[in-house]
Curated annotation (Swiss-Prot):
Belongs to the SlyX family. It holds the Pfam family SlyX. This is Protein SlyX homolog. The gene is slyX. InterPro entries: SlyX (IPR007236). Signal peptide: none annotated.
Amino acid sequence: MQGVQEQIEELQMKLAFQELTVEELNQEVIKLNQLIANQQHQIQLLIGKLKAMEPSNIATQAEETPPPHY
């Protein structure tokens, strides 16, 4: 009977370790989700700023006169 008791105790220890690991992984997932949400918000702010920018007075490369050829 001692062998069965040892097996049960070993399984209980493994289960406890797995529960701890799952909780640690869950906390990491929560942190990463918060980080992603923050980065998405920052990207949206940058997109808004880029859209609000006035066009540049500098001519585009297509509008520039070509350089003289030698």
